[in-house]
């Protein structure tokens, strides 16, 4: 087993070394590329997953496509009828679950199962069932699950094999609960102790440490079929402002961005990444509009897609945060601006009225031409491909008794004991 992890770590180190040279950050919008000429033989050579994704896309209504652009949360006392409305009317891409939504493993399992069953009756694509499970400060697993410490402690231990095992173990327990997407890890580089939001949640203060441990955690998660969504692109570390309450403005130039903030994201993309969370942070030296990255075509398209070569899904940080909604006069303006800039999915974790506004804005934008059909299909196709690639279904991976044996299992505790012996880092099971 240790030999396997040694091989994994060698591969990760090589990937990170290669990724430390980040392509030049774009100076601005690049001219459009002329459309490729059609090739009748290309259809025969098309990848089967791509062909299936395009077939599913062709059969979807505009309402179904708009719904795929939303991941939503809901209050703990939400009735089944309201959950059904998310699925039947809004046709959402997925849900984000918080501790308010369940009291223990049994209720979490039952909720995930119910959402999947409802969705399977009416929608063409399975749900993302998501959570924030970083370990430590940000941990949503119910009592009885295996809890790892904050990323800062894991990074200080200096054992990427430990980090891989942490990601893998978390993924096993998430999968047992019916969760298939995790908004983790944090890839922000934090050396400023005044950054109270992220100082414990970051693996360290250098691109090398954050890259090594971030890619290790991602590989561990994805080895068990859970989609990792690292955050907060393009980097929330160099500030003491919190985007929950304001729009952080970071005075970073091109050279610093290229040699520092972007390095962990480039390493993760090169190692294999299907989704990334985009933060509500502004970099006026790089994008003079002053818009947050989650609304900036410079970051969403020029840097993320063209410079870093990312082909997966871009998901916003929660758009109910002040760092986002304060950037335009209305929610509708924010949404249209973000989507046309290149964002794929809007995360809206709390308020039904805002979720309805976002869905209506997207639908109206598609119908009145502010959002082109080509742009809509581009994002929805990415989402379909990610769901197909990761084998998402609306059935639970395990029956309840088997799932309960996995969650907080003796095997996982034994892994923690092994890690404690190897590193001297105390990992707790709660």
Regions found by a protein language model. Give the residues of each.
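Second-shell loop/turn segments in exported
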Residues: 39-43, 72-77, 94-103, 151-164, ...
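Active-site-proximal loop/short-helix segments
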Residues: 141-146, 180-200, 231-247, 279-282
């Amino acid at each position: 087993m240790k030999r396997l992890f040694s091989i994994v770590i060698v591969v990760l180190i090589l990937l990170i070394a290669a990724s430390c040279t980040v392509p030049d950050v774009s100076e601005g919008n690049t001219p459009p590329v002329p459309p490729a000429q059609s090739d009748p033989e290309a259809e025969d050579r098309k990848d089967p997953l791509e062909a299936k994704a395009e077939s599913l896309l062709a059969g979807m209504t505009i309402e179904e496509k708009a719904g795929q652009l939303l991941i939503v949360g809901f209050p703990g006392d939400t009735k089944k009828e309201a959950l059904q409305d998310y699925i039947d009317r809004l046709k959402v891409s997925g849900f984000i679950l918080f501790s308010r939504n369940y009291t223990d493993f049994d209720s979490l399992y039952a909720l995930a199962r119910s959402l999947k069953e409802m969705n399977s009756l009416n929608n063409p694509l399975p749900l993302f069932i998501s959570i924030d499970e970083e370990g430590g400060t940000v941990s949503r697993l119910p009592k009885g699950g295996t809890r790892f410490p904050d990323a800062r402690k894991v990074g200080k231990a200096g054992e990427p094999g430990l980090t891989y095992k942490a990601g893998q173990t978390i993924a096993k327990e998430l999968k047992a609960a019916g969760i298939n997407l995790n908004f983790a890890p944090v890839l922000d580089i934090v050396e400023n102790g005044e950054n109270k939001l992220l100082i414990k949640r970051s693996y360290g203060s250098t691109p090398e440490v954050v890259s090594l441990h971030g890619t290790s955690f991602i590989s561990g998660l994805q080895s068990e079929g859970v989609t990792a969504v690292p955050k907060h692109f393009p980097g929330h570390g160099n500030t003491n402002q919190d985007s929950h309450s304001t729009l952080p403005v970071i005075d970073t130039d091109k050279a610093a961005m290229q040699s520092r903030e972007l390095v962990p994201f480039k390493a993760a993309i090169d190692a294999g990444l299907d989704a990334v969370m985009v933060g509500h942070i502004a970099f006026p030296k790089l994008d003079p509009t002053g818009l947050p990255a989650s609304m900036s075509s410079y970051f969403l398209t020029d840097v993320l897609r063209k410079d870093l070569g990312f082909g997966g899904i871009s998901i916003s940080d929660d758009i109910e945060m002040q760092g986002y909604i304060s950037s335009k006069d209305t929610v509708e303006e924010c949404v249209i601006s973000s989507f046309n800039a290149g964002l794929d999915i809007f995360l809206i974790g709390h308020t039904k009225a805002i979720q309805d506004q976002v869905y209506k804005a997207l639908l109206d934008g598609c119908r009145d031409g502010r959002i082109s059909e080509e742009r809509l299909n581009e994002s929805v196709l990415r989402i379909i491909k990610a769901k197909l690639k990761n084998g998402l279904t609306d059935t639970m991976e395990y029956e309840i008794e088997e799932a309960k044996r996995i969650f907080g299992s003796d095997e996982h505790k034994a892994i923690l004991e092994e890690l404690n012996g190897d590193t001297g880092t105390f990992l707790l099971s709660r």
